[in-house]
Amino acid sequence: MDKYLIKMPVKLNSIEVTEKKISAKEERVKQTNAAKKQIATNNNKRKNQDTPEMIKDKENAESENPPKRRSSRVTRSMRSMAEDGPASPEKEIPKKLPFIKYSGAIKYFTESQEIAASADEVMQWVEKQINMDVVPMAFDMEWPFSFQTGPGKSSVIQICVDERCCYVYQLSKLNKIPAALAALINHPKVRLHGVNIKADFRKLERDFPEMSAEPLIEKCVDLGVWCNQVCETGGRWSLERLANFIAKKAMDKSKKVRMSKWHVIPLDENQLMYAAIDVYIGQVIYREIEQRETVKLKNEAEFKEQNGDAAFKLVKGLGENFLSKINEVTI
């Protein structure tokens, strides 16, 4: 008889129905999240597999066909970008550049008498340069820094007058700057240059009061300011970015070395190389900007002679790099 019985569906109570609905909903949420996670994983895999050329093609495609909702109206920020034109070179992300390799001599001194003798030797070399009105000399300083106590006393002065040799003077044992080094730095024929060099002179004066900052500030050259004048760029420069833009070289500005104990004697090989490269590349940058300035002044003089002052002012008023545009303009 049992096999002929028909089993009627059992009516579930409301609590059981609710629990089943909740379980079904949670299951759907889990499936949805799992699907999203899988899609994200696949996208990341594809992104990581993209070659630089593929990434560049995607960026070009996006720039050529921007989303409509972005291009439907011009915002204030977009107007300012259009008015300002392309980004300044100092703000552009540099391409992969070769690192600076310095193979010249590094002359390192820690004793007052040794520093004085070396500075006197450099000064004699400067005075022998009879064909030069000024002798450019890259100048930089290093000191220890602590987040608890702040900057320490000036510990290292490094200079470079010839790219084949850099001088590193450690001041840790000194209570006073040797007279010969002070005379070299203040020599009327020496043109000190660097990045943010005025701040270095002010710190040097604070740490060694016998060194007056103002005379040095009056005759020094800030490479960033000079670059803006010659290359018609804008903004503030770091030495690293100037090396990228002017010398087309990358610098290894290791934080470990930069924040190291510059007051401890002796300096290690990494510290010596770091100090030497800073002034070496500074000297390279100076000579390159000097060469560009010579070419620029020559081009401007020729343009004025051919087209007159009015045309020259018109071209300068375009707000574009004169060196790159001068041959394209027809008056």
From Swiss-Prot:
Biological process terms from the Gene Ontology for this record are:
negative regulation of mitotic recombination; nucleobase-containing compound metabolic process
Which positions fall inside the 3'-5' exonuclease domain? 118-290
Give a GO molecular function annotation for the protein.
metal ion binding
Residues modified as Phosphoserine? 80, 88
Looking up SMART domains in the UniProt record yields: 35EXOc (SM00474)
EC number annotated for this UniProt entry? 3.1.11.-
One Pfam family hit: DNA_pol_A_exo1
Q: What is the protein name stated in its UniProt record?
A: 3'-5' exonuclease
Q: Which organism is it from?
A: Drosophila grimshawi
